[in-house]
């Protein structure tokens, strides 16, 4: 049985893709063994992220570390997948000639054939094309062991924000046909999955073709998935404010399975910076979306992405972001220092903000967000939360770990038969990034 080591960088879409790489290899070889140490593997894969420079350079650092393994085991296959593969292509082979296969997010289904071609010809294989929907037509049926699962409903992005490489590495937006998505979710539900997370770079741009040739939008998809037997909870990641329509907002009013948690990236609170980023909305328009959502779901927890130190960002513009964060009361969020990416329009902008100042802004924004997260955690003490039990606690092997609808980890004392089940937990203690709870007796 082939032994496979895979390291995944970046977003949840990459996590989904990594699972699919393992699936296509398992189908090809009649099963595989996933190992946690690279030196045990017959196949080593790096599923990469190019959103930030540090993530990209870490890939080449990791490749350097596995190079000696290739010298010891000439038959070892080393592969680079994901967005760095799409961006760099043949340059990866030039920089690291011991790499055997390089493939992008849309060609991962071709991995088994690429490995065969490498072994037959002795030549490194590169395929970073964008065949769109073909990938999903060639993936084996989803198999899961947990109570939650990702389902990719669309890929790519056509927004072309000035700082972002996604349209260049994952291609333009394309949606899976509605029936394909529903079949996968129904199959997962039959395997015991309770929670579905619909994935895409911009899920609210979903336009899936139906059997009659009509187009299904994202709000309609949510309503259909809501009625699939066995699915008890729904999430989606990630959405774009520009297409967050009233019909999607109304889903929060009508669909109780849709969790009271939303990740909606704003990036900045400054209209000038948002314009320079080519985001396509203003801070006021973003606030309007949130106001409508919270009128329907007062308990909605909102997370976001922020970039500090975007070229030309002034102190006043940063203060506008800080004020927006306080006004909206963002929950757990991701704050990054701007990282110029080759080939994007923003990479050509003049940047005169010292790195030390960018770090200060990063820390100041994180401080405000973490304080709000801690406040929300405290308000949950004494409440009863419906939770999905994920497995053994990462903090204490004698405890279990569950997740609330608003994306909190709850550690509690339970029994193994509770894993992958939905249970009610009373929150007894709150910490910075987790909660403690106890089972509510029936």
From Swiss-Prot:
Boundaries of every Radical SAM core domain copy: 143-375
Location in or out of the cell: Cytoplasm
Matches recorded under CDD domains: Radical_SAM
Sites where the protein binds [4Fe-4S] cluster 2: 157, 161, 164
PANTHER family documented for this protein: CDK5 REGULATORY SUBUNIT-ASSOCIATED PROTEIN 1 (PTHR43020), MITOCHONDRIAL TRNA METHYLTHIOTRANSFERASE CDK5RAP1 (PTHR43020:SF2)
HAMAP family: tRNA_metthiotr_MiaB
Name of the protein this chain belongs to: tRNA-2-methylthio-N(6)-dimethylallyladenosine synthase
Source organism: Neisseria meningitidis serogroup A / serotype 4A (strain DSM 15465 / Z2491)
Taxonomic path: Bacteria, Pseudomonadati, Pseudomonadota, Betaproteobacteria, Neisseriales
GN (gene name): miaB
């Amino acid at each position: 049985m082939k032994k496979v080591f895979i390291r995944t960088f970046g977003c949840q879409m990459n996590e989904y893709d990594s699972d699919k790489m393992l699936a296509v290899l398992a189908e090809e070889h009649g099963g595989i063994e996933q190992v946690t140490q690279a030196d045990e593997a017959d196949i080593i894969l790096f599923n990469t992220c190019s959103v930030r420079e540090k993530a990209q350079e870490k890939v080449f650092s990791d490749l350097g570390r596995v190079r000696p393994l290739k010298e010891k085991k000439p038959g070892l296959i080393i592969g680079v997948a994901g967005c760095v593969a799409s961006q760099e292509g043949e340059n990866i082979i030039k920089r690291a000639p011991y790499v055997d296969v390089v493939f992008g997010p849309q060609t991962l289904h071709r991995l088994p054939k690429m490995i065969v071609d490498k072994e037959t010809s002795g030549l490194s294989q590169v395929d970073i094309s964008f065949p769109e929907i073909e990938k999903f037509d060639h993936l084996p049926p989803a198999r899961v062991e947990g109570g939650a699962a990702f389902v990719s409903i669309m890929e790519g992005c056509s927004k072309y924000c000035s700082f972002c490489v996604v349209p260049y590495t994952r291609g333009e937006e394309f949606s899976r046909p509605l029936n394909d998505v529903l079949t996968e979710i129904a199959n997962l539900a039959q395997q015991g999955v309770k929670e579905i997370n619909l994935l895409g770079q911009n899920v609210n741009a979903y336009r899936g073709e139906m059997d009659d040739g009509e187009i299904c939008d994202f709000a309609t998809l949510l309503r259909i998935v809501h009625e699939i037997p066995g699915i008890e909870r729904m999430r989606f990641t990630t959405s774009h404010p520009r297409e967050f329509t009233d019909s999607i907002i109304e889903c929060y009013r009508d669909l109780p399975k849709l969790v009271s948690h939303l990740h909606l990236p704003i990036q900045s609170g400054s209209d000038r910076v948002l314009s320079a980023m080519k985001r396509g909305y203003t801070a006021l328009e973003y606030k309007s979306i949130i106001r409508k959502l919270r009128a329907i779901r007062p308990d909605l927890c909102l997370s976001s992405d922020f970039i500090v130190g975007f070229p030309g960002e002034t102190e006043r513009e940063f203060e506008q972001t800080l004020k927006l964060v306080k006004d909206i009361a963002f929950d757990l969020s991701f704050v990054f220092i701007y990282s110029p990416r080759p080939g994007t329009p923003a990479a050509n902008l003049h940047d005169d903000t010292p790195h030390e100042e960018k770090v200060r802004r990063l820390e100041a924004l994180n401080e405000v967000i973490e304080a709000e997260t801690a406040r929300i955690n405290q308000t949950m003490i004494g409440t009863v939360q419906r939770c999905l039990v994920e497995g053994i606690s990462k903090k204490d092997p004698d405890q279990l770990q569950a997740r609330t609808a608003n994306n909190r980890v709850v550690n509690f004392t339970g029994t193994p038969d509770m894993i992958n089940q939905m249970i009610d937990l009373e929150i007894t203690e709150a910490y910075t990034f987790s909660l403690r709870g106890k089972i509510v007796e029936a």
